[in-house]
Amino acid sequence: MDPLLTKIMPDRPGLIWMEQPVPYLRYSLLSSYPQLSHAVFTRNGGMSCPPYDRLNTSYDVGDLPRHVAANLAIIKDTLCARELMTMKQVHRTGILVIRTGGDRCRVQTPSADAVITNVPDLAVLVKQADCQGIILFDPKRSVLAIVHCGWRGNVANFLASVVARMKGEFGCEECDLLACIGPSLGPCCAEFVDHKMIFPEEFQAFRVKPTYFDLKAVSRWQLLGAGLTKDHIQISDICTRCRTDLFYSYRGEGTTGRFGTVAMLKQGEPRHANVH
């Protein structure tokens, strides 16, 4: 690995750092499954200029569209994806299900905060700048979910809804699901001065200082409550606000870009998909 990247990339157990064609990380929990491709891209290696430097994935933050398009093309090529799909993330609980079979229905930028799919060669990207990007994977049924979860998603227990939808739509069993929670706002920086107004009482168990909360631990607790097993959950302890050299942080920077968490199924031959 490039010596400069070695200096800036934190050494964390369970994270596999890659540097080509641009820097990104992979999870050890998911990396042994050949039917799944995934990556958490850093902010480095793209085309965008400050304050969006450099691998910004969002058209909605003020960056030049041609730079965003070039960055998304880099990500698509890195995963060798046939298609790359993004969502219009709205900090709510909308779930889009894309399944194989039937006529192809194209949805360019659906309003949703989670996608569940069994379609191969379709890469789905979550845009982040402090919120959690979470990958859920059922290796037995080759079903993938990718979730954007901010504090509002935690309050709504959005992850439990995603798990229930995976079970209802594809017959997934909770004990088979693997989950990875990526770089996001850490307990060191997740301050909510009005927490008594916005958080339910049970979140007090995750308060680390008078106004600071561990939202990654909240997500783990909610996944366990949804039926996942403890050893099937991996959490990155990287805080995006602390590591703006690697990731974008809305809290830390204000006007800035969005980094991407991407996942894609690879098994079998490509099939047509229905979206609903």
Regions found by a protein language model. Name each.
Residues M1-H276:
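Active-site microenvironment for binding and transforming phosphate-containing groups
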